[in-house]
Amino acid sequence: MESNLSGLVPAAGLVPALPPAVTLGLTAAYTTLYALLFFSVYAQLWLVLLYGHKRLSYQTVFLALCLLWAALRTTLFSFYFRDTPRANHLGPLPFWLLYCCPVCLQFFTLTLMNLYFAQVVFKAKAKRRPEMSRGLLAVRGAFVGASLLFLLVNVLCAMLSRRRRAQPWALLLVRVLVSDSLFVICALSLAACLCLVARRAPSTSIYLEAKGTSVCQAAAMGGAMVLLYASRACYNLAALALAPRSRLDAFDYDWYNVSDQADLVNDLGNKGYLVFGLILFVWELLPTTLLVGFFRVHRPPQDLSTSRILNGQVFGSRSYFFDRAHCEDEGCSWEHSRGESTSMSGSLGSSSWYGTIGREPGWCGGSQTRTTPLLFSQVLGPGGHHHSLYSTPQT
């Protein structure tokens, strides 16, 4: 064997693409990054319990998905320290869990964010047009259907490719077209929902303000998601278009030239390992880290000076986003409260997140008056004057 190789290729040319020390350093760097994200999300889940936030909410489900995603990616890269051949030749179930399932979890987190903000927008519109509330079921069904379609396509493609029952190029083409189209659509939907939440002030932007997030930050995060996932789709399609159908080795990236996951069964080379890590960093670790940072758990205020007062009730800044998500389905009032407010006393049940509606003519030129919600809400004094909730009412 040695004589045949020496006759074909000079001995000096038989060197690895990357030195072993570089490969080991890359493995340590990849594992450390994913492990740091894992412990960061794990700590935030403990903060939910420590601060007394709602245990089952959009926020906790989102963090749990990110925790599982980071755990699977950390486990995958830990194989490459000593057991690289085993990582490249896994059985169908371990292969799907380590390579394919993290991509599905990432898509589920994206659809979860879309679902929540879409509900916020629909509930804001339903105040003026009650028939809009019927469309909320259609929105939920659409996102659930998209998640199931994404999961089904990825599972089938992974199983068929591992059993060699279909052409790898055809499977990759189907998966890339479906998966990346859904990623781009959901990213555009998330950006649109964030813009609507920010623009429909004050009825919806209260969520961003109470969260401590500005409109610019929300728009920047949405724009970053669109750019990242759109570039991901373009990269995948370009890799497939430039690769021959018989062997997918375009750009010398071996079978990791498609960024979603590995569907072919060739061994992972050193150059492919380097590019695989960079791809996961740009198109998986970076967007997930941005979302985790944007929806992180906040510490509630400990004193009344940093709390908000609404109709005599004191609310901390933790009444934001996902901590009160149960209000959407557990009977919290989203209806308009009618009648004049004559004092700062009252109950939360007679108001809504979006403020109250009074019957004082002359303000805004109509028969109804609409107060701004939560942080900027006002009540009527005895003389018909408006007094800010941050000032002492006149007696």
From Swiss-Prot:
Lysosomal integral membrane protein that may regulate MTORC1 complex translocation to lysosomes. May play a role in autophagy. The keyword Transferase does not apply. GO terms for cellular component: lysosomal membrane. It comes from Bos taurus. Residues 1-31, 82-89, 162-175, 244-274 are lumenal. Belongs to the GPR137 family. Glycans are attached at residues 4, 257. Residues 53-60, 111-140, 197-222, 296-395 are cytoplasmic. It is found in: Lysosome membrane. The chain crosses the membrane at residues 32-52, 61-81, 90-110, 141-161, 176-196, 223-243, 275-295. Keywords: Autophagy, Glycoprotein, Lysosome, Membrane, Transmembrane, Transmembrane helix. The keyword Glycoprotein applies. It comes from the Eukaryota. This is Integral membrane protein GPR137. GO terms for biological process: autophagy; negative regulation of bone resorption; negative regulation of osteoclast differentiation; positive regulation of TORC1 signaling; regulation of autophagy; regulation of bone remodeling; regulation of bone resorption; regulation of ossification. It is a multi-pass membrane protein. Its main location: membrane. The gene is GPR137.
